[in-house]
Curated annotation (Swiss-Prot):
Annotated function: Responsible for the transport of dicarboxylates such as succinate, fumarate, and malate from the periplasm across the membrane.
Pfam families: SDF
Provenance organism: Serratia proteamaculans (strain 568)
Lineage: Bacteria, Pseudomonadati, Pseudomonadota, Gammaproteobacteria, Enterobacterales
Sample GO molecular function, one term: malate:proton symporter activity
Protein's recorded name: C4-dicarboxylate transport protein
Protein location: Cell inner membrane
One GO term of the biological process aspect: L-aspartate transmembrane transport
Similarity field: Belongs to the dicarboxylate/amino acid:cation symporter (DAACS) (TC 2.A.23) family.
Membrane protein topology class: Multi-pass membrane protein
Keywords attached to this entry: Cell inner membrane, Cell membrane, Membrane, Symport, Transmembrane, Transmembrane helix, Transport
Gene: dctA
Length: 429
């Protein structure tokens, strides 16, 4: 029994995170030098994301009986994303107005170092709904795979899947080849995941070593408020959605506990995307639904990022004594409904979208971003964790609404019954 615990990925990653925190705190210089370990692991995962999405989506769509079902799944998923992410934005706005973590700081924007956020402001100028939509279309198929752009790969995979489906029996050979290639890809993922503890250790040691615990204490009220809001959103909002669709949010969180720990260590929900695709299938969701909902959700269903954006923007206004009436806050909400859709599930993207939003609203001081910059890394963990749970719940819900969910397998797996999907997931180590 003890040996089984030591071999579990959950235990290994938890131990690695703890060691990373200790190293970063007591030996910050050494901890800061551990960054390549975390970066290397995330790069290994990114290397495999494009082929995983391609194989999953193509085999899922090509294997469906009707193409109308694919269109229906996509429409339902986008509707769900819009409703839930809007709720997340509203909850963030409500809590930050009630708690007011920035009130009383009385910071003069002119005294802040705007140079520190200049690079983010420059990137933010490139944000916009039209450039975002045009960017979904790749310049070339090879370019989409080379850059690892999730939505570009997804678009090509959907078109490829449709074309393969129309070939019928003539395309069976290609279908079999892609399915076999998919098995090889997931074999590679299994090997990469053995390095997850090392990646989590390096990323956490770097974060604590570079930014220190002091930066946590300095703006602790905002961080605590944000973390509690994310917990509230998962338990109350996602919990209610899960319950209404026949499963427990707590059992679901337990099911993906290893993925949550990896995300906690790396601060990026993208680091477990391939593994989530596999686990959601094991949970009883059809491959076609998983292949569409999970990758799309990484741009359109970022609940944690939505909460962060409203809270951070209003916090800057409170800290700099910038008055925001109802009209200003409604304007902020409308802008965020568009700009938040461009925040991919990678570390730092939320901060860039925040910069874009503040630039678009115009009422808030852009220099106020310097207040958030020092603690953004610590807030990214809660963002990524909430995003991951949100996308997992969305997949189950959309699968159920589209009648593409094996509910018996869902309940057996979440209850950890022998022979269920819970004991068929990728080996840990």
């Amino acid at each position: 029994m003890k040996l089984t615990i030591f071999k579990s990925l959950y235990f290994q990653v938890l131990t690695a995170i703890t060691l990373g925190v200790l190293l970063g705190h007591f030996y910050p210089d050494i901890g800061a030098q551990m960054k390549p370990l975390g970066d290397g692991f995330v790069k290994l995962i990114k290397m495999i994301i494009a082929p995983v999405i391609f194989c999953t989506v193509v085999t899922g769509i090509a294997g469906m009986e009707s193409m109308k079902a694919v269109g229906r799944t996509g429409a339902i998923a986008l509707l769900y994303f819009e409703i839930v992410s809007t709720i997340a934005l509203l909850i963030g706005l409500l809590i930050v107005n009630l708690v007011q973590p920035g009130a009383g700081m009385n910071i003069d924007p002119g005294t802040l170092d705007a140079k520190a956020v200049a690079v983010y402001a420059e990137q933010a100028q490139q944000q916009g709904i039209v450039p975002f939509l045009l960017d979904i279309i790749p310049g070339s198929v090879i370019g989409a795979f080379a850059s690892g752009n999730i939505l570009q790969v997804l678009l090509f995979a959907v078109l490829f899947g449709f074309a393969l489906h129309r070939l019928g029996d003539k395309g069976q050979l290609i279908f079999n080849v892609i399915e076999s290639f998919s098995r090889v890809i997931f074999g590679i993922i299994n090997m990469i995941m053995r390095l997850a503890p090392l990646g989590a250790f390096g990323a956490m040691a770097f974060t604590i070593g570079k930014y220190g615990v002091g930066s946590l204490l300095q703006l602790g009220q905002l961080i605590a408020c944000f973390y509690l809001t994310c917990i509230l959103f998962v338990v109350v909002v996602l919990g209610s959605i899960a319950r209404a669709n026949g499963f427990s949010i707590f059992k679901f969180v337990r099911y993906i506990k290893e993925e949550l720990l990896i995300v906690l260590g790396t601060s990026s929900s993208e680091s477990v995307l391939p593994r989530m695709l596999d686990k959601m299938e094991k949970l009883g969701c059809k491959k076609s639904v998983v292949g569409l909902v999970i990758p799309t959700g990484y741009s359109f269903n970022l609940d944690g990022t939505s909460i962060y954006l409203t809270m951070a923007a209003v916090f800057i206004a409170q800290a700099t004594n910038t008055h925001m009436d109802v009209i200003h806050q409604v304007t902020l909400l409308v802008v965020l409904l568009l700009s938040s859709k461009g925040a991919a599930g990678v570390t730092g993207s939320g901060f860039i979208v925040l910069a874009a939003t503040i630039s678009a609203v115009g009422h808030l001081p852009l220099a106020g971003l310097a207040l958030i910059l020092g603690i953004d890394r610590f807030m990214s963990e809660a963002r990524a964790l909430t995003n991951l749970v949100g996308n997992g719940v969305a997949t189950v819900v959309v699968a159920k609404w589209c009648k593409q969910l094996d509910e018996k397998q869902l309940h057996d797996t979440l209850s950890n019954k022998p022979g269920s999907g819970a004991d068929k997931t990728l080996p840990s180590a």
